[in-house]
Curated annotation (Swiss-Prot):
<keyword id="KW-1278">Translocase</keyword>
<comment type="function">
    <text>Core subunit of the mitochondrial membrane respiratory chain NADH dehydrogenase (Complex I) that is believed to belong to the minimal assembly required for catalysis. Complex I functions in the transfer of electrons from NADH to the respiratory chain. The immediate electron acceptor for the enzyme is believed to be ubiquinone.</text>
</comment>
<feature type="transmembrane region" description="Helical">
    <location>
        <begin position="28"/>
        <end position="48"/>
    </location>
</feature>
<dbReference type="GO" id="GO:0031966">
    <property type="term" value="C:mitochondrial membrane"/>
</dbReference>
<dbReference type="InterPro" id="IPR003918">
    <property type="entry name" value="NADH_UbQ_OxRdtase"/>
</dbReference>
<feature type="transmembrane region" description="Helical">
    <location>
        <begin position="373"/>
        <end position="393"/>
    </location>
</feature>
<feature type="transmembrane region" description="Helical">
    <location>
        <begin position="272"/>
        <end position="294"/>
    </location>
</feature>
<keyword id="KW-0679">Respiratory chain</keyword>
<feature type="transmembrane region" description="Helical">
    <location>
        <begin position="141"/>
        <end position="161"/>
    </location>
</feature>
<protein>
    <recommendedName>
        <fullName>NADH-ubiquinone oxidoreductase chain 4</fullName>
        <ecNumber>7.1.1.2</ecNumber>
    </recommendedName>
</protein>
<dbReference type="GO" id="GO:0015990">
    <property type="term" value="P:electron transport coupled proton transport"/>
</dbReference>
<keyword id="KW-0520">NAD</keyword>
<keyword id="KW-0472">Membrane</keyword>
<feature type="transmembrane region" description="Helical">
    <location>
        <begin position="53"/>
        <end position="73"/>
    </location>
</feature>
<dbReference type="Pfam" id="PF00361">
    <property type="entry name" value="Proton_antipo_M"/>
</dbReference>
<feature type="transmembrane region" description="Helical">
    <location>
        <begin position="306"/>
        <end position="326"/>
    </location>
</feature>
<dbReference type="Pfam" id="PF01059">
    <property type="entry name" value="Oxidored_q5_N"/>
</dbReference>
């Protein structure tokens, strides 16, 4: 594990070079391909070295982090062309990648907590440094307060786990039985806010709307998945309590997902719509993890990977339109098929992947999550029907409203898009649909 970490760390001095943008980009791509072929054990921890090691769950999420960070650099080439501190931007992306790499590969719960929290700092830098509106300061405050206040109780829980077991080394931890209810709440509350669960989701649309494209991609692609990964790890310690209390979180998130789907119908801001749809998808992931069965955990992994790639691609599409027309409003970005006909196919492909139509990885994830939630309680089937149906409705609403109809009369001319943009969208769509063909990787 350390060899990959050191390769990322030694990319940082390259940022001091005058023209490092595409060099760092190519080297992270190379690293992701080397890392891809390195896993040799599906079920056990492998590549263990000095409190770092991966199992299959963290391996897939590290791979997703490397992939999304490459695509962030590709998508943000307007920073490179305008020479708005491109070297510092690459440095922040590398710093964020190091934090994410260490979070997903930490075998000590305390070091996981430290890296989990410190991944907020580079994200805040991205929002404050390269965001668009002055309101980005408020979005940054929302982001910090929601996530930091929610995760302080988790620190107390880690100290008490250390008291009980005299270690925080993950493979040595066991379930400590029926402790008390607050212990359970504090353990998972930080991760539920990060996901985010309904009622604590207000920071997410705010952060997305104010963030640059790179910030939106990393938020939707990886940082929400940190919450799911944290719940998966903590379930080992609180599974006995989970049997008693999981029904409450599961019901809240599923009911919240349906309400958020209704909120999506009311959105006219493209970014805001995609951000709210992330909350609806993550509610399914929370439910899968809370059922604590094999279908649920593996389904939530495949939906996290699928959603990370597809929503990142949708944010790229909204940014392409924003850079061309200077607006994210659906009232102005309508009838785009008349102006950018070849971009419409990418809108369709990524929208269909986002609503879990075949052959995307989201379909595998949603099937297994439906399986696990209905096996947990057959009464949930009504809410699941609503959630699946409405997710298709608001995605099709976004696609048809933005692509079809008359174009806005104030738009006189529009570029068809650059090769870089089509290449970027292909690199989102291709792994998303390729992984569906190898679904057995997720259900070993």
């Amino acid at each position: 594990m350390l060899k990959y970490l050191f390769m990322i760390i030694f990319l940082i001095p390259i940022c001091l070079l005058g023209n490092c943008w595409w060099l760092v980009h190519s080297l992270i791509f190379l690293l992701s391909f080397i890392f891809m072929i390195s896993l040799y054990s599906y079920s056990d921890l492998s590549m263990i070295s000095y409190y770092f090691g991966v199992d299959f769950y963290s391996f897939m999420l590290i791979l997703l982090s490397l992939w999304i960070c490459c695509l962030m650099i590709t998508a943000s080439s307007s920073i490179y062309s305008s020479s708005y501190h491109p070297n510092f931007f690459v440095f922040v992306v590398l710093l964020l990648l190091i934090m994410l790499f260490c979070s997903f590969s930490s075998l000590n719960l305390f070091s996981f907590y430290i890296f989990f929290e410190s991944s907020l700092v580079p994200t805040l830098f991205l929002i404050l440094g390269w965001g668009y509106q002055p309101e980005r300061l408020q979005a940054g405050v929302y982001l910090m307060f929601y996530t930091l206040v929610a995760s302080l109780p988790l620190l107390l829980v880690l100290f008490s786990i250390n008291d009980l077991f005299n270690t925080l080394y993950y493979p040595l931890l066991i379930d400590f039985g029926s402790f008390y209810f607050l212990f359970y709440v504090f353990s998972i509350f930080a991760f539920l806010v990060k996901m985010p669960i309904f009622l604590f989701h207000l920071w997410l649309p705010k952060a997305h709307v104010e963030a640059p494209i790179s910030g939106s991609m990393i938020l939707a692609g990886i940082l929400l998945k940190l919450g799911g990964y944290g719940i998966f790890r903590m379930m080992k310690v609180i599974s006995c309590l989970g049997l008693s209390f999981n029904y409450f979180v599961l019901s809240l998130s599923l009911f919240g997902g349906v309400i958020i789907s209704f909120v999506c119908f009311r959105q006219v801001d493209l970014k805001s719509l995609i951000a709210y749809s992330s909350v609806a998808h993550m509610s399914l992931v929370i439910c899968g993890l809370m059922t604590m069965n094999w279908w649920g955990c593996m389904g939530s992994l495949s939906l996290m990977i699928g959603h990370g790639i597809s929503s990142s691609g949708l944010f790229c599409l909204s940014n392409i339109i924003y850079e061309l027309l200077g607006s994210r409003s659906l009232l102005i970005n309508k009838g785009m098929i008349n102006l950018m006909p070849s971009m419409t196919i990418w809108w369709f492909l990524l929208s269909s992947s986002n609503m879990a139509s075949p052959p995307s990885l989201n379909l595998l994830g949603e099937f297994s999550l439906l399986n696990s939630i209905i096996s947990w309680s057959s009464y949930m089937i009504l809410l699941l029907i609503f959630l699946s149906f409405f997710s298709a409705v608001y995605t099709l609403y976004m696609y048809s409203y933005s692509q079809h109809g008359l174009y806005y009369s104030g738009v006189y001319t529009c570029s068809l898009g650059y090769f870089r943009e089509y290449h970027l969208l292909f690199l989102h769509w291709f792994p998303l649909n390729l992984l569906c063909l190898k679904g057995e990787y997720f259900y070993f």
